């Protein structure tokens, strides 16, 4: 069976790999699987997209596929991924679909599904859709005549979502100056409206999408321009979102970049103080900084590690009934409010902590001392056997001994590329780079491409 779904839906180069034909089939078969699972003859489906030029093309094809199975489709227009997840749940829809490739370049696009509960589909549901995709025109229902349903626009859904986000905090943000970077994506209009409505003084960059400039040297994967703007405008802090608004990276008043680990620590510390952190636990991935775990330990907060990927964080949170988790990359899940990483929600919560504490972000984040980190990608012939390679393990053991507990090693295969990622954290930049290079050289020697 062909594997269409990755860790975050179906992605590819728009009109080449992710074609309108495939989008039609995903709509038709995805609509059928979810309608069948929910016991709905005429499922309600919400469809949102980011600002990519290919979004409208794929949206039209997807909606046609959904309509062909008898779905009642409501178009949300440009909205964030977590906005789709929230509205799917809130409006009692059987299915939510987001058309976006998140932080990827403009040429890419993707389609991800949310079930009626607002969570991404299970592996079993994705496999059911893939089975239908592999069949040649499977025999599925085809409504005709009056059984075909109109689709409608529900662009006011974005406002409903923003009103909800505003209700998650008890303070306004008057007196705070915040610079916002919308990555020329889904949050370009949403973020300025939300933070302005909360009475913050806002400056913006990356909030002028033209269909082609999404994530182009802006947003959470390029926070350097935001750092410059924060200093230039003397803002209290800056918030950078990614193309579909499910990530957040911050910048403090001194221009320092504050990553997902630090944001989770600041918010988690406040939740713990207020006895709002379920089981005194934060869920993170193996990529979180060693300094993150040490800072949590100092605060009496427990941690739980998962594989890289926000879906694994969410799985662990649901299993243990935890309400805060996320990734260093800025996917932060606050389960009390939403079912997926939500950059706007995280930004609002972080801003509320800053406002209520009366402390600058630099001071709040400084309680977590980050260990210098070095990451090297090595192209290999077979990424899946790196953990079994005795020579690589021997060098890793030697480095562990030399670090004497003041560092961490992570060697893992990439989830999407023919790469092995070597990550080392150590007490100094020099040590982190030296140790990472030593391990990477061994991986290259034993497993690398000629």
Curated annotation (Swiss-Prot):
- Which species? Staphylococcus haemolyticus (strain JCSC1435)
Q: Which SUPFAM superfamilies match?
A: Phosphoglucomutase, C-terminal domain, Phosphoglucomutase, first 3 domains
What gene makes this protein?
A: glmM
Which GO MF terms are attached to this record?
magnesium ion binding; phosphoglucosamine mutase activity; phosphomannomutase activity
Q: What is this protein called?
A: Phosphoglucosamine mutase
Q: Which reaction does it catalyse?
A: alpha-D-glucosamine 1-phosphate = D-glucosamine 6-phosphate
Q: How is it modified after translation?
A: Activated by phosphorylation.
Disulfide-linked positions: none
What are the EC numbers?
5.4.2.10
């Amino acid at each position: 069976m062909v594997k269409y779904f990755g860790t975050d839906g179906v992605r590819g180069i728009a009109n080449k790999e992710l074609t309108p034909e495939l989008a039609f089939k995903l709509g038709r078969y995805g609509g059928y699987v979810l309608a069948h699972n929910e016991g709905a003859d005429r499922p309600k489906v919400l469809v949102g997209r980011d600002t990519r030029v290919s979004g409208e093309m794929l949206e039209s094809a997807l909606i046609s596929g959904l309509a062909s199975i008898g779905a009642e489709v409501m178009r949300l227009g440009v909205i964030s991924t977590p906005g789709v997840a929230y509205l799917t749940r809130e409006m009692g829809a059987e299915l939510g679909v987001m058309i976006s490739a998140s932080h990827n370049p403009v040429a890419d696009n993707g389609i991800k599904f949310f079930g009626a509960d607002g969570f991404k589909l299970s592996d079993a549901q994705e496999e059911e859709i893939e089975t239908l995709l592999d069949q040649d025109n499977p025999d599925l229902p085809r409504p005709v005549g009056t059984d075909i349903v109109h689709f409608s626009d529900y662009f006011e859904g974005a406002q409903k979502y923003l009103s909800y986000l505003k209700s998650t905090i008890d303070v306004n943000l008057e007196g705070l100056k915040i610079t916002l970077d919308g990555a020329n994506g889904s949050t370009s209009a949403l973020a300025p409206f939300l933070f302005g409505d909360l009475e913050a003084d806002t400056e913006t960059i990356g909030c002028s999408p033209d269909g082609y400039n999404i994530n182009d040297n802006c947003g959470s994967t390029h926070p350097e321009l935001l750092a410059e703007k924060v200093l230039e405008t003397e803002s209290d802090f800056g918030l950078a979102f990614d193309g579909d608004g499910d990530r957040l990276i911050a910048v403090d008043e001194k221009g320092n970049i504050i990553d997902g680990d630090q944001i989770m620590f600041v918010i988690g510390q406040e939740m713990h103080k207020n006895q709002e952190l379920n089981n005194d636990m934060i869920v993170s991935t193996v990529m979180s900084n060693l300094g993150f775990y040490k800072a949590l330990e100092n605060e009496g907060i427990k941690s739980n590690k998962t594989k890289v990927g926000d879906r694994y964080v969410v799985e662990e949170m649901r299993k243990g009934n935890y309400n805060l988790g996320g990734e260093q990359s800025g996917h932060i899940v606050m389960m009390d409010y939403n079912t997926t990483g939500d950059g706007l929600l995280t930004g609002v919560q972080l801003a509320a902590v800053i406002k209520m504490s009366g402390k600058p972000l630099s001071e709040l984040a400084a309680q977590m001392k980050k260990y210098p980190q070095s990451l090297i990608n090595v192209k290999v012939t077979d990424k899946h056997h790196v953990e079994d390679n005795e020579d690589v393990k021997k060098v890793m053991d030697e480095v562990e001994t030399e670090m004497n507990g003041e560092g961490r090693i992570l060697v893992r295969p990439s989830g999407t590329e023919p790469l092995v990622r070597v990550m080392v954290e150590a007490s100094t930049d020099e040590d982190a780079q030296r140790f990472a290079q030593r391990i990477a050289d061994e991986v290259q020697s034993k497993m690398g491409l000629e």
